[in-house]
């Protein structure tokens, strides 16, 4: 049954496939900084796709329909987390392909530094956003999701100088911590979703 739930979310994504192709092309032409290009692409594709699955569930009332079927709520949560991981890997592959097209980019060094840091930050963000999305209805969750994406970025840009090189020194710790946080987040989402009423 989890496979069918995953398939459902990916069928929804086909409608937006053209945008996922156009975004990297647009940023490839607009940005010269390869680190920023990769980070922006991976964040937009991953977060955008996940938000769209929740939006489609809310719009089509598919959550209500799915919950009326003999499916455990934890299976619904697991399916959404698996979809998030698959989309993250797809966005990383697209990002690496785009980076490979850039002249003068050391792809192996790029993977060890920027890519690992980017994946870690996306996993941390998903660890916060997914439980909120399972806990609240889509309309409430989307505002919190956007705030959580925009506010920290704006605050760090305005008041702090973000140094990717310093962040990259702690890549291994950050990556392991983000994976642990993502796993804990899945259990939290499960508990919140089981208590939610439809």
Task: Put a short name on every predicted segment.
Residues 68-73:
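Short helix-to-coil transition segments within interhelical loops
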Residues 75-77:
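Alpha-helix N-cap/helix-start motif at helix boundaries, enriched for small hydrophobics
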């Amino acid at each position: 049954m989890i496979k069918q739930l995953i398939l459902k979310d990916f069928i929804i994504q086909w409608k937006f496939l053209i945008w996922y192709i156009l975004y990297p092309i647009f940023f490839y032409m607009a940005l010269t900084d390869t680190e920023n290009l990769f980070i922006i692409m991976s964040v937009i594709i991953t977060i955008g796709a996940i938000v769209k699955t929740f939006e489609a569930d809310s719009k089509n009332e598919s959550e209500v329909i799915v919950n009326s079927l003999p499916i455990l709520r934890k299976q619904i949560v697991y399916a959404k987390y698996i979809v998030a991981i698959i989309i993250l890997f797809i966005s990383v592959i697209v990002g690496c392909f785009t980076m490979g097209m850039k002249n003068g980019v050391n792809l192996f060094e790029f993977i060890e530094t920027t890519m690992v840091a980017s994946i870690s930050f996306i996993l941390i963000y998903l660890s916060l956003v997914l439980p909120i999305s399972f806990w609240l209805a889509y309309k409430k969750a989307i505002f919190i999701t956007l705030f959580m994406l925009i506010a920290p970025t704006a605050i760090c840009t305005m008041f702090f100088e973000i140094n990717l090189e310093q962040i990259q020194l702690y890549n291994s710790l950050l990556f392991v911590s983000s994976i642990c946080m993502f796993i804990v987040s899945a259990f939290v989402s499960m508990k919140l979703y089981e208590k939610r009423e439809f």
